[in-house]
Design a protein with these regions (language model features):
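Pyridoxal 5′-phosphate
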Residues: 1-314
Length: 314
């Protein structure tokens, strides 16, 4: 495992260090710009060929499309574990099976699930897993990292100070120093370690159950309100604890502002750095209002949020 400043840096390291000139890569419409922009840059600078598995109006993908898009020169599948807009969780184990059957790697963006959804890299077949510390892992901003299967060789994205092998011309080959050029955020990493103690004491599965219950309570409360449109698949037994919605044709930023100013409720409006998913959902112009639920939220807070949505919609 190597530490980074966030999942964006981790994904840049993995994508830039594993995908070479002329390679083919498969990704999805579910991705955050932290996946999309590194891929687009390699398309322009290295001639990397890109294909994207489309998402439907619920934000769902058809796994047959991964099979369909595979080519002899496919180097990797790069995809999120959970959409940061819909909360839909992708079947990473299934995708890994498809990728590995064709000799391709699987790079996973676990920004939305690390700390809140149990993840077993070996059981799922993940080659590289990238995460951020400030979301479900409850750590400080400026922390993140990537977990790497032992036989995966990533070319360093940045080089420089390493504290060891100082007389060598090149970055040390050994992990994690290979990918950790420069001074690390030691204070942030210490905070992340303290947060992990809290998570491990409670248990990721228990956190997942608590957050899912709050998310489900909110969804059940708002889905029947006239004028409210909710995005994502809520029939799946496992999903991220977020609910994205719109109220009539109201601008999502205006709704979010009213929730904050009038009701004291913090939400995220707009595009969520997920342009392809918004196009799939048909919300490019309006954006969406995203409610995110923590195991520290209460049922009373959820009920207050439902009441606020109802009041704005009336």
């Amino acid at each position: 495992m190597a530490f980074t400043a966030n999942s964006t840096e981790a994904l840049n390291i993995a994508i830039s260090g594993l995908i070479h000139k002329g390679d083919h890569v498969i990704s999805t419409d579910c991705e955050h710009n932290s996946v999309l922009r590194p891929l687009y840059r390699l398309e322009e600078e290295r001639g990397v060929a890109l294909d994207f598995v489309p998402a439907d109006r619920q934000g769902l993908v058809d796994y047959a499309d991964f099979e369909r898009l595979m080519r002899p020169d496919t180097r990797a599948v790069v995809c999120t574990h959970c959409s940061n807009l819909t909360g839909n969780i992708l079947d990473i184990g299934r995708i890994a099976g498809i990728a590995h059957s064709r000799g391709a790697l699987l790079i996973v963006d676990a920004s939305q699930t690390a700390g809140t959804v149990p993840i077993d890299m070996q059981a799922l077949g993940v080659d590289v897993l990238c995460f951020t510390g400030h979301k479900g892992l409850m750590g400080p901003q400026g922390t993140g990292g990537l977990c790497i299967r032992p036989d995966v060789e990533i070319d360093p994205w940045k080089v420089g100070g390493s504290g060891v092998h100082s007389y060598d011309r090149h970055q040390p080959k050994e992990y994690p120093t290979r990918l950790e050029a420069g001074t690390l955020n030691s204070h942030g990493i210490a905070g992340l370690s303290a947060a992990l103690d809290v998570i491990l004491e409670r248990g990721v599965a228990d956190i997942q159950r608590a957050e899912h219950a709050l998310m489900q309570r909110f969804y059940d409360g708002v889905r029947g309100i006239s004028g409210v449109t909710v995005y994502g698949d809520f029939s799946a037994p496992e999903r991220g604890a977020i609910v994205a919605l719109n109220i009539r044709d109201y601008d999502s930023s205006a709704v979010s502002d009213e929730l904050a100013v009038t009701y004291g409720i913090a939400t995220r409006p707009g595009a969520h750095c997920a342009p392809r998913m918004h196009r799939a959902l048909g919300t490019t112009e309006q954006g969406a209002v995203r409610f995110s639920f923590s195991c520290y939220n209460t049922e009373q807070e959820v009920d207050a949020a439902i009441a606020a949505v109802r009041a704005i919609a009336e």
